[in-house]
């Protein structure tokens, strides 16, 4: 038994006395920022994360549809399976999660503390794939819009969705820039 707790049997049960001193964080098995789940629990959590039809995608699609825009979604015929495809405008929209696409400088992207070599490779592959997709669409003279999660997430979500929708519509109707990136504040 360490000096942190004392155990005594009282009335046939177990009584755990409060610690006489608080633990030193350097000696804790769980430090802030470390994974507290076992591999099976982590696998279950990660497998429940959706890769399409996320709430952000649905919100942007709903806002565009309400304005009369018609589109395709996650069509496998298009490289990278863009979240929204607007063939009439030769435009594709990717709605990127800040964590999964390693959005540098974003408050929603925090590099994981556990299994760092895996995550380093994963983020490098994701970024390389994103760059390949962007290059492909630019070579095919399609326009590409990247909407980052941080542009919509947080307080005043409905206002942020409206602002993002308005910016996309302006880009589609009035501008012919080949690339648009919408980031959070």
Regions found by a protein language model. Give the residues of each.
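Extreme N-terminal basic, low-complexity initiation segments
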Residues: 1-10
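Short hydrophobic alpha-helical segments enriched in small aliphatic residues
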Residues: 12, 16-17
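Short hydrophobic targeting helices and cationic amphipathic motifs
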Residues: 23-25
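Nucleic-acid endo/exonuclease domains
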Residues: 27-146, 151-185
């Amino acid at each position: 038994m360490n000096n942190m707790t004392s155990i005594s049997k009282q009335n046939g049960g177990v009584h755990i006395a409060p610690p006489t001193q608080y633990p030193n964080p350097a000696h804790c098995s769980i430090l802030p920022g470390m994974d507290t789940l076992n591999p099976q629990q982590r696998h279950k959590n990660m497998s429940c994360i959706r890769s399409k039809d996320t709430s952000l995608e649905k919100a942007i699609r709903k806002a565009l549809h309400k304005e009369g825009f018609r589109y395709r979604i996650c069509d496998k015929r298009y490289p990278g399976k863009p979240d929204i495809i607007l063939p009439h405008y030769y435009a594709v929209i990717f709605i990127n999660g800040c964590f999964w696409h390693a959005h540098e400088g974003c408050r929603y992207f925090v590099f994981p503390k556990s299994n760092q070599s895996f995550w380093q490779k994963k983020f490098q592959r994701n970024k390389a794939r994103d760059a390949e997709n962007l290059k492909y669409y630019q070579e095919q003279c399609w326009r590409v819009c990247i909407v980052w999660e941080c542009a919509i997430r947080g307080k005043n979500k409905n206002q942020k969705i409206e602002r993002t929708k308005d910016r996309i519509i302006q880009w589609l109707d009035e501008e012919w820039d080949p690339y648009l990136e919408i980031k959070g504040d």
